[in-house]
Amino acid sequence: MSRLREEVTAVPSALRTLEQERAKHAWDCVQNCLNQAIQQLESAIAHETEPRRREDLEKRLRNLRTEEGGKEWKGRYGSVVRKLPSYILTNGLGQTLAFLKAKGKGEPGNEHEVLYRHLTDWVGRKVHADGDLLSWLVNTATSQQYRLATMEALALLQWLKRFAEAELPKGREE
């Protein structure tokens, strides 16, 4: 009987640990989202050779470093986080990731780009995706792997949404 009890209690412990990992990752994402946007911009500026583009990136960086600009950016990030679970349930994970990627336009420091990276880093690791998660979902994943990735994304977004609502300013509706 005690062996059965150990096996039964081991499962919730493992689930609790996974939930704690998700919560920690989501907390780190929400707490560091603006800093990650700033780091992306700094990196892009360092590698940019075209003067006009570099000037535009520097202007965006200066804006993010202001209190008002940072607050506005966090509000937009939080707004996207709050909407994303319904996007996934309505359109699917692949289409939602494509939406984030399109809205991010590969622009460093864009809230959609930062959230895309948060989701793809976490979900990609959990489902052992090779390379870019979106590409893996479209080209390689089985339907079972796609469902697992979707469930993992929704579970992470549950935590991201909670922490965004608690920690980030309300963004204006898009």
Which role does the model predict for each range below?
Residues 1-174:
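Small/polar/charged residue-enriched interaction surfaces, especially the RNA/DNA-contacting tracks
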